[in-house]
Amino acid sequence: MTTVSLSLDEILDLAKKTLLANGCDEETASILADLIMKAERDGSLSHGLFRLPAYVAGLKSGKINGKARPEVKKISPSVIKVLGNNCLAPMVLNKGLPELIKAAKENGVAVLAINNSHHMAAMWPETETVAEAGLVAFACTSYKPAV
């Protein structure tokens, strides 16, 4: 088996072009390609290019809407809900995190709940975004019981 080494810029470009060619719009492709590149950069290969074929399959099947726009709803001063409209979770987080950060700074604590989105992907880049804003973050996702 031949190993091909790619630079981070090449990974970003490959991921973005692949997503664009398979149904994502520019914004969604850029957000997800950046996350894929960061996963590769940080050594989390299971959330880097490895995920690209599954994203493409979801886009082609219609399970994932690569052009959807999440809807942000403020439930209370410290609870933000984002309806994913079947887009990928990184797109949802891109729209919801600024609202979460604002609410946490105004109220001391805040929660971001998302639904109807697909695959959370790597979650540390989002918690890093919150930490860079001077806050503490805890991220979790639901999944089938494993115990």
Go through each PLM region and give its residues.
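Generic N-terminal amphipathic, Lys/Arg-enriched alpha-helix
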Residues: 1-22
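Aromatic/hydrophobic pocket-lining residues that form π-stacking "cages" and hydrophobic walls in ligand
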Residues: 15, 100, 126
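N-terminal and secondary-structure boundary signal
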Residues: 20-23, 42-46
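Alpha/propeptide regions of enzymes that mature by internal proteolysis
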Residues: 37, 90-93, 97-115
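Active-site cofactor/substrate anionic-group-binding motifs, chiefly glycine-
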Residues: 48-101
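Glycine-rich anion/phosphate-binding loop at the beta-strand->alpha-helix junction
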Residues: 109-147
